[in-house]
Amino acid sequence: MGLLVFVRNLLLALCLFLVLGFLYYSAWKLHLLQWEEDSNSVVLSFDSAGQTLGSEYDRLGFLLNLDSKLPAELATKYANFSEGACKPGYASALMTAIFPRFSKPAPMFLDDSFRKWARIREFVPPFGIKGQDNLIKAILSVTKEYRLTPALDSLRCRRCIIVGNGGVLANKSLGSRIDDYDIVVRLNSAPVKGFEKDVGSKTTLRITYPEGAMQRPEQYERDSLFVLAGFKWQDFKWLKYIVYKERVSASDGFWKSVATRVPKEPPEIRILNPYFIQEAAFTLIGLPFNNGLMGRGNIPTLGSVAVTMALHGCDEVAVAGFGYDMSTPNAPLHYYETVRMAAIKESWTHNIQREKEFLRKLVKARVITDLSSGI
């Protein structure tokens, strides 16, 4: 009798397991289906609560008729804030108003619970962490810091600016305005020294990947956090070398020479949550899904990724140095070098036009502020 009860309970447990597994798999497939639609087809859009959006929204879920005026409820909410005062929740509130699918909660950096994050677990880099568990675990076991600095974490309201590398920054004298922000994010190896008048002198985060990292240790700002954006598995391997101060091999799958040393102690190093790359690419910009793999024209630029990160982690968001003007092919591409605008047309991975459309939506709806007016 006892054996029959045991077998019955075992079968019930097995059935329950199979049902739950089927439901989980079905939900996952439905979730992927929304991204796998052809980029030219109509995509059903839902808000963050799963409700279908109406015809007043575009295929991605953005409001079609964007207005620079604040929605009435937000105008009332922020009416009593003085000019220049930081407005808590401002960027995310406006983002949700024009894009109801937006859901703010998302950690800025990977922490020791990263393997529990379903949104990134099933995707390989750059859209997730699949296959990178051991490397990431080894890195985090040494860095042991997963947040902003305590001083920044304690702020009731955070004003952030993403400083792009665009030539539009030259001769704008925006340096002092940039330095007024609580968090100043810089990208790749864009220099500060010698350009302070236009780009400021403050750096809070420097987000990069191995090929984009500064190669001379003296170029790094002393008080900034070094943040890896992992676009391929070799990037995580490179960061492990850096954190453990091991020798970096130049032949480890990089498309150009990389830094062999980063003058930062492990607690000053972070790994960007790859969800922001995934969200920017497929949800906000609408790049081809390509089965969740890196492919032609489906990788967002680091600038758009940083903006996406800021929408989740900051109360107010601004940009400077953004925007490519393809009508002026001989204009400088970056503020610090002589490479011309035409070079960006040769990009295999980016879709500059789609990104421009995304950023223009944010500027028009006042979700972000464009200090250099390049977007």
UniProtKB/Swiss-Prot annotation:
Subcellular localization(s) per the UniProt record: Golgi apparatus, Golgi stack membrane; Secreted
Domain of life: Eukaryota
Pathway annotation: Protein modification; protein glycosylation
Sites where a glycan is attached: N80, N171
Entry PTM: The soluble form derives from the membrane form by proteolytic processing.
Membrane association type: Single-pass type II membrane protein
Disulfide bond annotation, renumbered to this chain: C160-C314
Organ and tissue specificity: Highly expressed in adult skeletal muscle and in all fetal tissues examined and to a much lesser extent in placenta, lung and liver.
Disease implication from the record: Intellectual developmental disorder, autosomal recessive 12: A disorder characterized by significantly below average general intellectual functioning associated with impairments in adaptive behavior and manifested during the developmental period. Developmental and epileptic encephalopathy 15: A form of epilepsy that manifests in the neonatal or the early infantile period as severely impaired cognitive and motor development, due to recurrent clinical seizures or prominent interictal epileptiform discharges. Patients develop infantile spasms, mainly of the flexor type, between 3 and 7 months of age, which are accompanied by hypsarrhythmia on EEG. Other features include poor eye contact, hypotonia, primitive reflexes, and irritability. Seizures evolve clinically to Lennox-Gastaut syndrome.
Family per record: Belongs to the glycosyltransferase 29 family.
Name of this protein: CMP-N-acetylneuraminate-beta-1,4-galactoside alpha-2,3-sialyltransferase
Organism the protein comes from: Homo sapiens (Human)
Gene designation: ST3GAL3
